[in-house]
């Protein structure tokens, strides 16, 4: 133990209350003065709050800040201004600035052929607008008129150069209809291993109960006909991710899995990635756009899974770190090359 620590040990068990009881009123007042927090740099505070008391005299009266400011302002107005050492005579020195006159440019007289003179004399506003666009005079018209005249082979500017250009009328695009999938019927078909059901698409259905999604994953364990399973934007969390992981360990027919845009955390993604290692039929996996960033450890696990699973040729995730991104790109290139060689055979 150093000497400094030994000195600190002396004051560790000191009772502050006992020390304060032994102090006299004068000593307590001095201690209170030392512990006061002052702000000497704040010019908006009165002097009494910017420094400690320098005297023991009692105040002659209460502090009236407004009266003090009025008194200082009145004193400042009553002080006479100092006379200038050199009186101002009003003499002007130097020459005033006179702007030089600019010469008006003379327009050149251009003589055209009689045929062009006659064509321009009888040209309409729409034709003049197209001619100006072809000659590159884009300052005489709007961008819409200019590009319409350049891109179109016919006269399309019927309004003229100086007219008000109307905006294009766009066709209203209706919203996409809701997902018409009946969850109960899909669950029955998956349980009965219906050979006509090869795709389960529950995208954008956000009111599916978690127990029903868990039952669907449980039914997928023994299904041999479903090739694509998509749960995009279904508000699925870690319980659903764990059920998907259990399904991947037993299912041997699923080829595409999409669980993007959900509430799956890094724990749920890690469980899915570990289960992908035990699945040899999955070729496409998409896990991007979760509620929270999974972390560096999950991204490294993704790169490792892609390196160890040559069956995956499509992977949907936006890496934030350069190392896992480069490893995943190399693994995907290798997996696609292996798939191409297998097709040749």
Swiss-Prot record:
Main location: cytoplasm
Organism of derivation: Bos taurus
Annotated compartments: Cytoplasm, Cytoskeleton
GO CC annotations, alphabetized: cytoskeleton; myofibril; striated muscle thin filament
Protein name: Tropomodulin-4
Quaternary structure and partners: Binds to the N-terminus of tropomyosin and to actin.
A single BP term in Gene Ontology: myofibril assembly
Gene behind the chain: TMOD4
Biological role stated in the UniProt entry: Blocks the elongation and depolymerization of the actin filaments at the pointed end. The Tmod/TM complex contributes to the formation of the short actin protofilament, which in turn defines the geometry of the membrane skeleton.
């Amino acid at each position: 133990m150093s000497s400094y620590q030994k000195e600190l040990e002396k004051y560790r068990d000191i009772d502050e209350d006992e020390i304060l009881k032994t102090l006299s009123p004068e000593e307590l007042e001095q201690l209170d003065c030392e512990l006061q927090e002052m702000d000497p740099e704040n010019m908006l505070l009165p002097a009494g709050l910017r420094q400690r008391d320098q005297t023991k005299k009692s105040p002659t009266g209460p502090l009236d800040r407004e009266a003090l400011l009025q008194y200082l302002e009145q004193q400042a107005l009553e002080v006479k201004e100092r006379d200038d050492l050199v009186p101002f005579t009003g003499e002007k020195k130097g020459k005033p600035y006179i702007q030089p006159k600019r010469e008006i440019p003379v327009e050149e007289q251009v003589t055209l052929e009689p045929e062009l003179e006659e064509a321009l004399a009888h040209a309409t506003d729409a034709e003049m607008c197209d001619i100006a666009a072809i000659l590159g005079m884009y300052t005489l018209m709007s961008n819409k008129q200019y590009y319409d005249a350049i891109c179109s082979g016919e006269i399309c500017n019927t309004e003229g150069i100086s007219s008000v250009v109307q905006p294009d009328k766009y066709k209203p695009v209706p919203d996409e209809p809701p997902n018409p999938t009946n969850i109960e019927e899909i669950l029955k078909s998956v349980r009965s291993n219906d050979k006509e059901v090869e795709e389960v698409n529950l995208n954008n259905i956000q009111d599916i109960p978690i127990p029903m999604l868990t039952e669907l994953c449980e039914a997928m364990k023994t299904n041999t006909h479903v090739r694509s399973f998509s749960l995009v934007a279904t508000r699925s969390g870690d319980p659903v991710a764990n059920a998907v992981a259990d399904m991947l360990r037993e299912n041997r027919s699923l080829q595409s899995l999409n669980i993007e845009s959900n509430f799956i955390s890094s724990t749920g993604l890690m469980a899915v990635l570990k289960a992908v290692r035990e699945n040899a039929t999955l070729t496409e996996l998409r896990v991007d756009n979760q509620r929270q960033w999974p972390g560096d450890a999950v991204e490294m696990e993704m790169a490792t899974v892609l390196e160890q699973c040559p069956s995956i040729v499509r992977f949907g995730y936006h890496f934030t770190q350069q190392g896992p991104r480069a490893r995943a790109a190399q693994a995907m290139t290798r997996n696609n090359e292996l798939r191409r060689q297998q097709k040749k055979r």
